[in-house]
Curated annotation (Swiss-Prot):
Residues 16-121 form the Core-binding (CB) domain. GO terms for biological process: cell division; chromosome segregation; DNA recombination. This is Tyrosine recombinase XerS. The active site is at 210, 234, 306, 309, 332, 341 (o-(3'-phospho-dna)-tyrosine intermediate). It comes from Streptococcus pyogenes serotype M1. The keyword DNA-binding applies. The lineage of its organism: Bacteria, Bacillati, Bacillota, Bacilli, Lactobacillales. One of its GO terms (cellular component) is cytoplasm. Keywords: Cell cycle, Cell division, Chromosome partition, Cytoplasm, DNA integration, DNA recombination, DNA-binding. PROSITE patterns: CB, TYR_RECOMBINASE. Site-specific tyrosine recombinase, which acts by catalyzing the cutting and rejoining of the recombining DNA molecules. Essential to convert dimers of the bacterial chromosome into monomers to permit their segregation at cell division. Gene3D superfamilies: 1.10.150.130, Intergrase catalytic core (1.10.443.10). It holds the Pfam family Phage_integrase.
Length: 356
């Protein structure tokens, strides 16, 4: 979503929220939480407050009037009823064939509520230096996580990675072959953004940064001499990320056309730009997702930018056998999340042995 549109939607949600949610928003903005995260949380709060009103757990006529005492006195049984509502309500819609919200969506909703309750019961201070209330009912609500072994997850992901020679082959395909299948009109659009699109794909494959980190890159954050970029990690921590050398040519080619092609002025700080009616804007996450999906589907299989992150991590582990190095590259504080890549690489090694 374009940044300007995202901020507009955030303001729309803020306009209907209770004062304590606005306090929460301001506090998390200072952490800083990303605007995308805060937008998703505000959507979840609206879903929750709508349910409170529908379930007659508040007498407030509108969301903004729901007071703190309502949240303070909700019981574990109330929250379990909300979870049941999330699981079952879509099936009550006769026009829908869905059986209910996915467990992932439900977990996201509960995570947003847990964050709000933690703020209200632990983090915020009133005039006496105390939190607004002390009873955190969310601590009593358990979440169900999807059960899947690392081996199973590795097998599912492996088919969507561009390992070995496929990394450069994918870039080469976009650079030299993709255009051949296009109509003359489509070729014009492709050529306008070719250098930029290749630079984005190359950066994702060469650094393993998250989509949000790539979107938020500014010109000042990119050092092509050192092949290092500065990003804001989850939790607001600034980090320096090494970029593999194969991306340098693609990034340089994009920079050579960036100003002229996208009408960029001094005030246009974003590294990756799009242009509409002569006005440059930061390229948004949705556009990059669609772009990566389009090219990857034509090359082999449709993937997300996150799979390009997995690709880099797997290739790096295969080359170094160091989970510590991989976790540092990805911006993780623990090596536990990199266990997945050992399984993928071990499977690849087994397949290689079987082919001897």
């Amino acid at each position: 979503m374009r940044r300007e549109l995202l901020l507009e939607k955030i303001e729309t949600y803020k306009a209907i929220m209770p004062w304590y949610v606005l306090d929460y928003y301001q506090s998390k903005l200072a952490v800083p939480y990303s605007f995308t995260t805060l937008y998703e949380y505000l959507k979840e709060y609206k879903r929750f407050f709508d349910w409170l009103m529908d379930a007659d757990l508040t007498q407030a006529p509108k969301i903004a009037d729901i007071d703190l005492s309502t949240l303070e006195h909700l019981t574990k049984k109330d929250l379990e009823a909300f979870v049941l509502y999330l699981r079952e309500r879509p099936s009550l819609n006769t026009y829908s064939t869905k059986e209910g919200l996915s467990q992932t969506t439900i977990n996201r909703t509960l995570s947003a509520l847990s964050s709000l309750y933690k703020y209200l019961t632990e983090e915020v201070e009133n005039d006496q230096g105390e939190p607004y209330f002390y009873r955190n009912v969310m601590k009593k609500v358990s979440t169900k996580k999807k059960k899947e072994t690392l081996a199973s997850r590795a097998e599912n992901i492996k088919q969507k990675l561009f390992l070995g020679d496929e990394t450069l082959a994918f870039l080469d395909y976009v650079d030299k072959e993709y255009e051949q299948k296009l109509s003359n009109r489509a070729k014009s659009s492709f050529r306008k953004n070719k250098e930029r699109d290749l630079a984005i794909i190359a950066l994702l494959l060469a650094s393993g940064v998250r989509l949000s980190e790539a979107v938020n890159l500014d010109l000042k954050d990119v050092n092509l001499n050192m092949m290092i970029i500065e990003v804001i990690r989850k939790g607001g921590k600034r980090d320096s990320v090494n970029v593999a050398g194969f991306a340098k040519g693609y990034l340089e080619s994009y920079l050579a056309v960036r100003q002229r092609r996208y009408k960029a002025e001094k005030q246009d700080l974003a590294f990756f730009l799009t242009e509409y009616r002569g006005v440059p804007n930061r390229m948004d996450a949705s556009s990059i997702e669609k772009m990566v999906g389009k090219y990857s589907e034509d090359f082999k299989i449709r993937v997300t930018p996150h799979k390009l992150r997995h690709t880099l991590a797997t290739r790096l582990y295969d080359a170094t056998k160091s989970q510590v190095l991989v976790s540092h590259q990805l911006g993780h504080s623990s090596t536990q999340v990199t266990d997945l890549y050992t399984h993928i690489v071990n499977d690849e090694q087994k397949n290689a042995l079987d082919n001897l």
